[in-house]
Amino acid sequence: MAQENPDAKTLKAAIAKFLKDEKSNIAALKHGSGLESALFGRMVTSDVLASRDAAVYVAHAFTVHEAQVENDYFTVVDDLLREAGEQGSAGIFDTELASGLYYGYVVVDVPQLIANLEGESAKDWATLPPAKRELSGRVVQHLLHLIPTVSLGAKRGSTAPFEWAKFLLVEVGDWQPRSLAGAFQNALPLEQPALRESAVQMLTDEIGKLDAAYGTTLDRRFLALDKVDVPNAQRLSLNDLATWVQTYITQGTSPDKVV
């Protein structure tokens, strides 16, 4: 386009005409990238206007206690070599394994998710009718079922790494999100009695400190296996927790505030 329009004025006019002609195509590209791109974003190097910002941010999980690594020794045997009557193996290796209690953190940018799924402006999400927020509510509802119940699948054959979350906290608000990772600035010792209960207590203590410093600005609900008191929060089952969030997003306000 620049070669065809060397003059700045004609180039500007050509770009404006191109954008006008391609406006519907660009909108279709943004709206037609599928659920995965709506959740986790998409980068298109050939057309930056077709890129999409992620609506879900996932932090790297870390253990809340001192890590202890074990070496797992294993060999890979060459069956053909053995059948030939020779000694040896195709490889001798070891892998490092660690079993820990992890803290994970996930943020869902609801306005961005609605914008990605519905093709609306993120800043206008609160004024949209419930029908425009319904799909996003259902997506987050399903996501909330997946986060605590689906484990990473690496080395499944030799470790069976399947587990469900023991504590799940959901906070909803319009402030910038904030992690509770600072609760574990000082890692728990491995010999800590009642390790899981101690970790949850550290989280609730951190919540109390943040509330005291910044005020209670978030609606929160939680799931827990153990007896725990979370400041300004109600305990729910996973199904009720996911339904609460879905209703919150669809209505645009806390379900408890709707008469």
For the regions a protein language model found, what residue spans apply to each?
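Basic polyanion-binding and macromolecular-assembly surfaces
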Residues: M1-V259
